[in-house]
Amino acid sequence: MKEVIFTENAPKPIGPYSQAIKAGNFLFIAGQIPIDPKTGEIVKGDIKDQTRQVLENIKAILEAAGYSLNDVIKVTVYLKDMNDFAKMNEVYAEYFGESKPARVAVEVSRLPKDVLIEIEAIAYKE
């Protein structure tokens, strides 16, 4: 059985997709970009500012589904510029302290709305 997850505390999808889908004990979170859900605007600033907003959006979706950051098991990070990797990691480490999920980070030529970062995540909860 699958369940669509939606919360006003994260940005509305910018296309024909769900914020997240819960399937069994898994939660699949769609790629999140640094949109402030209160304003609907892209967060201005550097990679740290944008990474923080993306992770706050993911956290809000997790909480809406009854999960937490500790339940995240896999993350995919899309960066516009791999030179931002170290700065992104500084912020990322604030959110994933002891419970570090498996992760991949790749550089891409372009992201929606020309943002610097997009992150998708998979969570699992017994």
Swiss-Prot record:
Listed Gene3D superfamilies: RutC-like
InterPro entries, per database record: RidA, RidA_CS, RutC-like_sf, YjgF/YER057c/UK114
Pfam families from the UniProt entry: Ribonuc_L-PSP
Molecular function per GO: deaminase activity
A GO term from the CC aspect: cytosol
Membership in a protein family: Belongs to the RutC family.
Database matches in NCBIfam families: Rid family detoxifying hydrolase (TIGR00004)
Protein name: RutC family protein PH0854
